[in-house]
């Protein structure tokens, strides 16, 4: 269902990445997470932001079913939620983990509406990466566009 629950520590901010398939994981999620970790390492100890990286895989007809195993092998997330558990997470997020009061949901693959729903449910900000079209701009806090 999920990974890393016992290893999680109390963090002040959650960075939740929404994604769906193998292409999005390797071309978008992995580099974005690497950048977050570079930023975290570059700050001196007094300035470090205490955040947790979490990955939520969402239902997708193009998924291979191995996305969880691939993301888990990177050892970059404190929590990974499988796509088959997405609806349970959306309905009862606190049954999966403790969620910091502050956070951000970043859409990097799947249906953009999933990130809108999860961000609203958790009370977090939402950033949608839109390669071509942002489908829910009225409910998105920020849009990151390719062009």
Please provide the spans of the model-predicted regions.
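N-terminal amphipathic/basic-hydrophobic helices that include classical n-h-c signal peptides
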Residues: 1-7
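Extreme N-terminal starter segment of soluble prokaryotic enzymes
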Residues: 10-15
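Active-site and donor-binding regions of nucleotide-sugar-utilizing enzymes
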Residues: 17, 21-22, 26-147
